[in-house]
C-alpha cells in the first residue's frame, strides 16, 4: 500500500516537471520570435502599430491591399504567427478573411474596427476571431498580442496544461458559504445552475427567472363589509353565521374573488368587535349589577332571598310577609334612598337554651299574639319604632316575635 502511494506521487511529480518545462519553452519563444501581419487601408495606422510593436521585439509586416495580404499569407504561411485584420476592409472584409484564414491556414486572427457594435463583435466571434479590439489599438493590447498564439497551440496539445496553482491550507479547508449552496428539497427549485471553484474561490449561482406570484391580499372595503352584514342577516343572524354559507351567499351577490378563509377571518373579527362593544354598553346603561347580574343571582328578586325566621328563634308559629320585589333596586337593599345602610335594623334577641325551653314549655304563650297585644306587652308603640328607625323601608311590626317580652 505504501509502495503504491510512493509510485503515484512520483508519477505526479514527473508530470508536473514535464508540463513546467514545456510552458517555459513556450514562454522563451514570445514575443521575440513572433511574426505579425497587420492589414488596414489607413497607412498611418499601420505605421504607428508597427513602431509600437517593434518596441516589444515583434516582427511586423503591414499591408493595405486585402488580396495581396491574403496571397502573402498563402506563400509564407509558416512564417506568420498571428494576423490583425480590419473589420471594414474593402475587397475582403474581416469576416471573409476570418473564413479563409481559419479554414486554410488555421492562424489566430484579431479583428480591429473603428466601432464596437455588439452585432459586429458577435459576428467576429462567431466566425472564429480570437479577439476584437477598437482603434486606435492600445499599447498594452499590442504588447500582449502573443497570448493568442500560445492559446492556439495549447488547443492542439491537450497534454500540455498550465500547472495548477498551489493552495494554502486555509484555502483547502475554507468552508463554502451555506446560504449560496442550495440543499436538497425546496431550495433546488430556486436555482438552475451552480458553479463552485475551490481553487480561486469563485462561487456563482444563477437564480430562476420565474418566481411564484404572490396571492393578492384581501381588502375589506366599506361596501364589501355592508354586503357581509347583509349576508349575515339573510342567513339568520350572527349566531347562525358560518364561513361556508356566507361565501355562498356573497357569491350569489356577485362578489368574486372571495375565499372561505377570507370570510372566516373577517367573521371572527366581527364577532370579537360585537362582544367588545356590547359589554361597555350594558355597564353604562344598566349599572354593574345588571351587567354582571348573572354572576350574582342571589341579589335578583325575592325568590332567591331567605325571608323566613329560623324555627328555634320562635316560641310559636309565626307568619312573616316576604320582602317585596320593589324593595330591591339593582340588586341592593335600599336604605334611605342610598345603597349604604346608615341605621341598622334592631338585632334579633338572643335566646339561650334555658329561655328556649321555658318558652316552649309554657302553655300561656302558645298562641299567636296580634300586633296591638305585642306592643302593649313590650311597652313600645308603632310611633316609637318609627321615630327610632325613620328610614326603614319595611314595617318593623312585621319582624316582632310573638310572645317575647321586650322590656
Swiss-Prot record:
Protein location: Nucleus
Gene3D superfamilies reported in the protein's UniProt record: 3.40.50.2300, Homeodomain-like (1.10.10.60)
Keyword Phosphoprotein in record: yes
DNA-binding region: 217-271
Motif segment (Nuclear localization signal): 214-217
Highest taxon in the source lineage: Eukaryota
GO biological process: cytokinin-activated signaling pathway; regulation of DNA-templated transcription
UniProt GO MF annotations: DNA binding; DNA-binding transcription factor activity; phosphorelay response regulator activity
Expression (tissue specificity): Detected in trichomes and siliques.
Pfam families according to UniProt: Response_reg (PF00072)
Entry-linked InterPro entries: ARR-like (IPR045279), CheY-like_superfamily (IPR011006), Homeodomain-like_sf (IPR009057), Myb_dom_plants (IPR006447), Response_reg_B-typ_pln (IPR017053), Sig_transdc_resp-reg_receiver (IPR001789)
Record's keyword terms, sorted: Activator, Cytokinin signaling pathway, DNA-binding, Nucleus, Phosphoprotein, Transcription, Transcription regulation, Two-component regulatory system
Domain Response regulatory: start-end pairs: 35-150
Residues the record lists as 4-aspartylphosphate modifications: 86
Principal location: nucleus
One term under GO cellular component: nucleus
Post-translational modification note: Two-component system major event consists of a His-to-Asp phosphorelay between a sensor histidine kinase (HK) and a response regulator (RR). In plants, the His-to-Asp phosphorelay involves an additional intermediate named Histidine-containing phosphotransfer protein (HPt). This multistep phosphorelay consists of a His-Asp-His-Asp sequential transfer of a phosphate group between first a His and an Asp of the HK protein, followed by the transfer to a conserved His of the HPt protein and finally the transfer to an Asp in the receiver domain of the RR protein.
Known function: Putative transcriptional activator that binds specifically to the DNA sequence 5'-[AG]GATT-3'. Functions as a response regulator involved in His-to-Asp phosphorelay signal transduction system. Phosphorylation of the Asp residue in the receiver domain activates the ability of the protein to promote the transcription of target genes. Could directly activate some type-A response regulators in response to cytokinins.
The family this protein is said to belong to: Belongs to the ARR family. Type-B subfamily.
NCBIfam families xrefs: myb_SHAQKYF
Subunit architecture: Binds the target DNA as a monomer.
Protein known as: Putative two-component response regulator ARR19
Record organism: Arabidopsis thaliana (Mouse-ear cress)
Name of the encoding gene: ARR19
Amino acid at each position: 500500500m505504501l509502495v503504491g502511494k510512493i509510485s503515484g506521487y512520483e508519477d505526479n511529480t514527473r508530470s508536473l516537471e514535464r508540463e513546467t518545462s514545456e510552458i517555459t519553452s513556450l514562454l522563451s519563444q514570445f514575443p521575440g520570435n513572433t511574426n505579425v501581419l497587420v492589414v488596414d487601408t489607413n497607412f498611418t495606422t499601420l505605421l504607428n502599430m508597427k513602431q509600437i510593436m517593434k518596441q516589444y521585439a515583434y516582427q511586423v509586416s503591414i499591408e493595405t491591399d486585402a488580396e495581396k495580404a491574403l496571397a502573402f499569407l498563402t506563400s509564407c504561411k509558416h512564417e506568420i504567427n498571428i494576423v490583425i485584420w480590419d473589420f471594414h476592409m474593402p475587397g475582403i472584409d474581416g469576416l471573409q478573411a476570418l473564413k479563409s484564414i481559419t479554414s486554410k491556414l488555421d492562424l489566430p486572427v484579431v479583428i480591429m474596427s473603428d466601432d464596437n457594435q455588439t452585432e459586429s463583435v458577435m459576428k467576429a466571434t462567431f466566425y472564429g476571431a480570437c479577439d476584437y479590439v477598437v482603434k486606435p489599438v492600445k499599447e498594452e493590447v499590442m504588447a500582449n498580442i502573443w497570448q493568442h498564439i500560445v492559446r492556439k497551440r495549447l488547443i492542439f496539445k491537450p497534454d500540455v496544461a498550465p500547472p495548477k496553482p498551489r493552495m494554502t491550507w486555509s484555502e483547502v479547508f475554507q468552508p463554502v458559504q451555506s446560504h449560496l449552496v442550495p440543499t436538497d428539497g425546496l431550495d433546488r427549485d430556486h436555482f438552475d445552475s451552480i458553479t463552485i471553484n475551490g481553487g480561486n474561490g469563485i462561487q456563482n449561482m444563477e437564480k430562476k427567472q420565474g418566481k411564484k406570484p404572490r396571492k393578492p391580499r384581501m381588502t375589506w372595503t366599506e361596501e364589501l363589509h355592508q354586503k357581509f352584514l347583509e349576508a349575515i342577516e339573510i342567513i339568520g343572524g350572527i349566531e347562525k353565521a358560518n364561513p361556508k354559507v356566507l361565501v355562498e351567499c356573497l357569491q350569489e351577490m356577485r362578489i368574486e374573488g372571495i375565499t372561505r378563509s377570507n370570510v372566516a377571518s373577517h367573521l371572527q373579527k366581527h364577532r370579537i368587535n360585537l362582544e367588545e362593544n356590547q359589554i361597555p354598553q350594558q355597564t353604562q346603561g344598566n349599572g354593574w349589577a345588571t351587567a354582571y347580574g348573572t354572576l350574582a343571582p342571589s341579589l335578583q328578586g325575592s325568590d332567591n332571598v331567605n325571608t323566613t325566621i329560623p324555627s328555634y328563634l320562635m316560641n310559636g308559629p309565626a307568619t312573616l310577609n316576604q320582602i317585596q320585589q320593589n324593595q330591591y333596586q339593582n340588586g341592593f337593599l335600599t336604605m334611605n334612598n342610598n345603597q349604604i345602610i346608615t341605621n341598622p335594623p334592631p338585632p334579633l334577641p338572643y335566646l339561650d337554651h334555658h329561655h328556649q325551653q321555658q318558652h316552649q314549655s309554657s302553655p300561656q304563650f302558645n298562641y299567636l299574639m296580634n300586633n296591638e297585644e305585642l306592643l302593649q306587652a313590650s311597652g313600645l308603640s308603632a310611633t316609637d319604632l318609627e321615630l327610632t328607625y325613620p328610614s326603614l323601608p319595611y314595617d318593623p311590626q312585621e319582624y316582632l316575635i310573638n310572645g317575647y317580652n321586650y322590656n
